[in-house]
């Protein structure tokens, strides 16, 4: 018995040392959230009273291309297009400043970080949650909710990723124009649109994502017509191109134009790169960021949005959704998405990769109405098991279509060819060809293009909740659309 006690003591000491070492290692990979504790609240305003803007003069806040896109499709402007009331914004700022001055023991900071025209909402950020609560008493605020709070700590930023100087010898597929991208475009019969000159020229695509690592340095993107970038998560960030490479891979599926290496589905389109996904946290405010990005895309005159993002639950369960919410009308992000076709924009959104988990279904905003939700298949045209399935709660077919995403050929943030899996990557493959089809059929409306793609997919006559309407045939869509135009 005398030897057992020292042995137990020794084992306990080893366990404590191991636990301490593990904790130290974990802590070393994290850092305190910059600036301390902050909160973001969303305020819904009751109306757009005393607006200096008029639907008769939309050029004051919408680009000519945006106005022309609507005119071409016969779409009228409405009250949702008007900016939020400047009077209410000034009153919010005045009241917040007054409350802040009354705080004696601490420095109170606050700022309006964004608005939504379509939902008539305002986002305010402050380190004083009581200030945000007090503002809810203002008579023009119809609804208020917290949509973000800073975490106690975040992962340390990743080291700078070096870009490769050139392609590896094995990246080239000699004699194959599309290189590694051949299967993903030929599966959709999109190469035939390219063969007659429709490669996305004249079309503008907004890519909504979480990061576009090294898109400013990777040689293949030097040929890409990038109109601009905008960060809705950290508007003043100087590291736009140093975040995750998820958006880099997404962009490459459309914009790459390196024959025998990788040619994407719309190499001649123009692009806006819009960051609206916060990689450090997962909270409802990202729906607001996504909405702000979509509204920006609208005002900039974008034709198509490619979004490989989806949500269903959040950190600290702040605003988690239930399956019954998959109706296209409940989640803010889904309500935004459902409005896009009515503004003349086609949204192509990923179905989500939760098919093998407890959720199993598509995520938000994949449940939206009048969009193309994209699932994933493998090279044998078999469903990828990770793909979220339908239907929506109100019985609509989802996903709408499927494309190669298990795996897809892409360009990483290092500038190398990789193969990655997910509906994140089948989505831009489809989005690029939507641009080519719309280029070929410029007189079609957003809704007509969406319907044409569904109707010419492989199982339009017998859709299901796994493949939706099936694998699109963009050449067939073009031929039928062309006949209908004549």
Positions of predicted regions on the chain:
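N-terminal domain-start motif of subtilase-like serine proteases
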Residues: 25-34, 112-116, 128-133, 156-207, ...
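Extracellular S/T/G-rich loop segment that most often corresponds to the catalytic His/Ser-adjacent loop
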Residues: 209, 363-439, 443, 476
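N-terminal signal peptide c-region/cleavage motif recognized by signal peptidases
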Residues: 19-21
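Hydrolase catalytic cores
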Residues: 251, 274-278, 303, 361, ...
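Catalytic-core regions built around general acid/base machinery
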Residues: 327-344
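Inhibitory N-terminal propeptides of secreted protease zymogens
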Residues: 27-163
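Subtilisin-like serine protease catalytic core
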Residues: 181, 191-230, 236-286, 300-303, ...
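Short acidic, glycine-rich surface-loop motifs adjacent to enzyme active sites
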Residues: 295-327, 350
